[in-house]
């Protein structure tokens, strides 16, 4: 599964993030369910038995496996694959009206994947090399679309597919170059979907809210830095 995170630098100096990936769904509706899956997938002779037990106690996970299989297809380019937000957010208008939405980044270049034979023998970093060459010819663009929830679509379960077909393009994300120097001079880069701006409200999705805690722990292990008040409140 591949991902794309975007950090918007706002005029007042604050930032807001979106996080997307190639899978349209998460494998679990709760953090504990995801941890249970990781434990069941630990290598060993008892893994098949552990996985069978997991699926018996988490039957909805079966529906996520075909989605994950599709998400693992090898793209011809990072620029020819779609990325999807797992979580819903409540968008609130100036007049107080509100709708729940999920995010999608759709490649302007259209989706294009490689067959197994075409991908065979490619260098491990061929996607990065391809993107660099593509950027030499101009920006890479994605349409920023939101899917508006229908009456039966869950705003708090990232493992549940939405039935709504109401999709609106709200902007364009443009990539103009590669940033090869990250986290220098004490600058710690964190893309946290709980970091929102005015008019966007996180839902009570437990996986969404757990991500801030997970990212804070990751930063502390990786850099020794405590995010402290910089981390969004959960």
Task: Give the location of each predicted region.
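Active-site-adjacent core segments of small-molecule enzymes
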Residues: 1-234
């Amino acid at each position: 599964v591949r991902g794309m995170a975007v950090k918007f630098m706002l005029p007042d100096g604050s930032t807001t993030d979106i996080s997307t990936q190639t899978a349209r769904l998460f494998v679990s509706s709760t953090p504990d369910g995801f941890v249970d899956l990781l434990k069941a997938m630990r290598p060993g002779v008892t893994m098949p038995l552990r996985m069978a037990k997991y699926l018996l106690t988490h039957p909805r996970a079966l529906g996520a496996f075909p989605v994950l299989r599709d998400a693992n297809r090898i793209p011809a380019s990072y620029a020819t694959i779609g990325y999807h937000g797992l979580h819903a957010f409540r968008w609130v208008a100036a007049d107080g009206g509100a709708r729940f939405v999920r995010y999608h980044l759709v490649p302007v270049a259209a989706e294009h994947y490689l067959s197994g034979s075409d991908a065979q023998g490619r260098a491990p970093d061929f996607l990065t090399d391809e993107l660099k060459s593509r950027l030499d010819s101009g920006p890479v663009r994605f349409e920023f679309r939101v899917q508006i929830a229908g009456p039966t679509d869950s705003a708090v379960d990232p493992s549940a597919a939405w039935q709504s077909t109401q999709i609106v393009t709200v902007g364009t994300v443009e990539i103009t170059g590669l940033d090869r120097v990250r986290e220098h001079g004490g600058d710690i880069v964190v893309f946290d979907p709980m970091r929102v701006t005015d008019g966007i409200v996180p839902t009570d999705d437990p996986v969404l809210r757990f991500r801030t805690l997970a990212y804070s722990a990751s930063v502390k292990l990786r850099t020794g830095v405590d995010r402290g008040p910089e981390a969004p409140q959960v």
